[in-house]
């Protein structure tokens, strides 16, 4: 009788406390880099249209990741340690472009001049040894991220620096907060993704921003053709069709812990790997290098069979 009462008491506690993980058995929690949320929301919507029983949600990342999640989105090249514990799918690539407040003196001048590597380094980085461009206007304000994040890490690494060497006003929050700060400051300059620089519906530059042209072939000057990349599709076409310089590009990685036992999370991730590519351009992403996604899918399928 005592044993029966103990079992009933234990079951009662479980009912009150719920699952240890805090998630229902078929709930999938996604977190990670916030500028990827719009395209992830599209994937969730499309997946639920054919799997209406699915319970998938995004939990916003703050300074740290949520305590419990199934899938993680990252936007920089990861080191060896996390790769040993997680299975990664590289879904597409994002590119970083210089932008300025459209009313700024900087935008008016450099929408014509464009940025070379020398100007880029002087504008954005603390480097006493970098070659200087004396023509830079005095009245400009650089904005950058405060916390470690994919975009600033990728941006700095491309030019040979660390994130902490990016100069300017550090803004807490996500990448879109840089854009909000810049739009309020008529001296503002920053770097951002194609998806944030261009309107999602029209593909044209977000109102109030100027995308600054850059020296794509590395010859030290910005040509008429390089200045003519005036919308989202033009940039994507240029970046996918040729090897370019002065545009940092990195993969968006979706990952799952190899010990994760949530079958719906694995199923959704595999579905995304099969269906993600058709949405990339509309959200400002480049397709990945040939063969990489196929290789990642094969590794993921192998994990699912275990």
Label each residue range with its predicted role.
Residues 1-28:
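Bacterial Sec-dependent N-terminal signal peptides
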Residues 27, 50-59, 137-141, 159-173, ...:
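A local structural motif
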Residues 45, 124-170:
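Ligand-binding cleft/hinge of the Venus flytrap
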Residues 80-94, 199-241:
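Ligand-binding "clamshell"
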Residues 24, 242-306:
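Extracellular/periplasmic juxtamembrane helices and adjacent flexible linkers that interface
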Residues 148-223:
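Ligand-binding pocket segment of bilobal, Venus flytrap-like solute-binding proteins
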Residues 35-43, 116-120, 151-155, 174, ...:
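Stable alpha-helical elements in mature extracytoplasmic
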Residues 23-125:
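N-terminal segment of the mature folded domain
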